[in-house]
Every structure is written in C-alpha cells, then in structure tokens.
C-alpha cells in the first residue's frame, strides 16, 4: 500500500466555513478518481503542546489529508488520470499551501514503498 500524507493550510482570508465546505467537496470528488483506493481529510481541531517528548513547532496547519493506493500500478493510473488532474485543480481553489509526505510502515507484511 502506498500512502501519501499532506499537511494543508487554507489561503489567507478564507473563512473556516468555506474551507470546511471545500474540504468536504474535495472528499466527495475523490470517489471518482481512478487508482485512488482511499482519501481522507481531517480538520485540525487543536495543536496541543503538552507532549511527553520535546515539542517542535511546524507552523499553523488547518487540515491533514491522506491518499491510499493499492500499489505502484494504481498510483500510475492515478497520476495519468484527467479526473485526478481536475481534482488537483479543485484543490488549488482552497489549499493555500501543502507539505506532502510519502510514508512507510514500521512493521507488518507491507513493504516500504
């Protein structure tokens, strides 16, 4: 499984309500994207600082998105899709900045991708 995680920041001046609505619309649009196994977006409700290890600040984050792909072939299908390209165009309308990460498992049978 390939998993991509995104830290998302809304554009300056966009209301929380508009950002929430566009996140929901983006989630709903994700169901039609070829090769995309699962998409989830969650709004950041709080950024606690009372951690059990030293805290480091990454700046303000409004939401966290994650995309799942079954394998490299599914990811290639996703990348080539015109529907995915249109989905990304929608993302440009409500995502001011993002920071992507491709993650890898620490245990289990799933190979690091």
Curated annotation (Swiss-Prot):
Noted pH dependence of activity: Optimum pH is 6.5-7.
Q: Binding of 4-methylmuconolactone: at which residues?
A: 26, 39
Positions in coiled-coil regions: none
Question: What GO annotations for molecular function exist for this entry?
Answer: isomerase activity
Q: Does the keyword Acetylation apply?
A: no
Is Iron-sulfur a UniProt keyword of this protein? no
Q: What does this protein do?
A: Isomerase involved in the degradation of 4-methylcatechol. Catalyzes the isomerization of the dead-end metabolite 4-methylmuconolactone (4-ML) to 3-methylmuconolactone (3-ML), which can then be further degraded through a modified 3-oxoadipate pathway. Can also use 1-methylbislactone, but not the isomeric methyl-substituted 4-carboxymethylbut-2-en-4-olides.
Identification of the protein by name: 4-carboxymethyl-4-methylbutenolide mutase
Supply the source organism for this entry: Cupriavidus pinatubonensis (strain JMP 134 / LMG 1197) (Cupriavidus necator (strain JMP 134))
Q: What is the lineage of its organism?
A: Bacteria, Pseudomonadati, Pseudomonadota, Betaproteobacteria, Burkholderiales
């Amino acid at each position: 499984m390939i998993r991509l995680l995104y830290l998302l920041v809304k554009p300056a001046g966009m209301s929380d309500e508009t950002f929430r609505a566009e996140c929901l619309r983006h989630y709903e649009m994700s169901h039609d994207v070829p090769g995309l196994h699962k998409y989830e977006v969650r709004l950041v409700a709080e950024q606690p600082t009372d951690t059990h290890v030293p805290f480091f600040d990454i700046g303000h984050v409004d939401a966290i998105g994650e995309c799942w792909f079954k394998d490299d072939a599914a990811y290639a299908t996703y990348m080539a899709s015109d529907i995915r390209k249109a989905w990304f165009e929608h993302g440009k309308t409500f995502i001011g900045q993002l920071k992507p990460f491709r993650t890898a498992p620490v245990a289990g049978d799933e190979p690091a991708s």
